[in-house]
Amino acid sequence: MGKLTLLQCLSGHRGRVWGAGWHPRDPVLATCGEDKTIRIWADDGTGRWVPKTVLSDGHTRTIRDVAWSPCGRFLASASFDATVAIWDRRSGEFECNATLEGHENEVKSVSWSKSGALLATCSRDKSVWIWEVAQEDEYECAAVLNTHSQDVKKVEWHPNEDVLASASYDNTIQLYREDLADSDWSSFDTLASHDSTVWSIAFDASGSRLASCSDDQTVRIWQEYKPGNEFGVACPDGKTPVWKCVCTLSGFHSRAVYDISWCKKTGLIATACGDDMVRIFREVAGSPANEPTFEMVASKHAHSQDANTVEWSPTVAGLLVTTSDDGDVKLWKFEDDE
């Protein structure tokens, strides 16, 4: 088992806090919420996190998600006002240098590809958009993907390839890639196992596994099987990998599971749930790759209302952030007993 310890509660947002994003290198955190603001927090050098900046002029409605570019210079924010704002902190101060328009309804999620050359967004309008970063302040729409039949909740890029995953109210996950012959983006696999809305998804460090969480109160682990794999899983065209559900975590959550994060440093999975709890799971050592088992190693009543977001720090092992309907942002430290 392990121990989850509260390090600090960051107060400042008014109303629900929807999203949080760690800077890829620096001890900096961005959060966003119902109050239409983005708040930037930083470690003051002593381990205490302090407010640095409030960005309040980019959106006219709730801000649902924030994501830093891989280089750490740009911050993208997705809003219920149907736009995505791109913030540039080159000069040290944040400036909104682009507003991406095109979605017809609330934008729910935003994600940068590993190279930073592509940005994905998704919306209540059932679409996923892929944007090419032409220049630092120019973004061109490369694809509009209308594969889902309902509200799209989350987009997440593969950590090593230009492969995109999206999760939807239609209970499915779609996987997309570009056909290099004609530059068209399309779905190459539909992952359908959940019984209700898929709220969030997260790749592991290798990108060969994907975790998903749902309104059906479960977490599912999906495994990629490439052509000629040792397990004998057939790939229909002999070229395209297929993804299979290899593990279902059920009985741990008592409400909808709203977010999931797979730590790239430790392999631990964290979930944020509608029962106000945060839970940590670890793969059981020695469990087979195509039939893995996971155990819950920590749980904490983290908030007084729904836990909306959980995200592991990309730079500090065991550090994670949670956000909630209760208006708080909390920083936690997980320590393993083993």
Curated annotation (Swiss-Prot):
PROSITE patterns: WD_REPEATS_1, WD_REPEATS_2, WD_REPEATS_REGION. Transmembrane segments: none annotated. Keywords: Repeat, WD repeat. The keyword Repeat applies. The keyword Repeat applies. InterPro entries: CIAO1/Cia1 (IPR028608), G-protein_beta_WD-40_rep (IPR020472), WD40/YVTN_repeat-like_dom_sf (IPR015943), WD40_repeat_CS (IPR019775), WD40_repeat_dom_sf (IPR036322), WD40_rpt (IPR001680). GO terms for cellular component: cytosolic [4Fe-4S] assembly targeting complex. WD repeats lie at residues 12-51, 58-97, 102-141, 147-186, 193-232, 234-252, 253-291, 302-338. SMART domains: WD40 (SM00320). GO terms for biological process: iron-sulfur cluster assembly; protein maturation. It comes from the Eukaryota. Essential component of the cytosolic iron-sulfur (Fe/S) protein assembly machinery. Required for the maturation of extramitochondrial Fe/S proteins. Belongs to the WD repeat CIA1 family. This is Probable cytosolic iron-sulfur protein assembly protein Ciao1. It comes from Culex quinquefasciatus (Southern house mosquito). The gene is Ciao1.
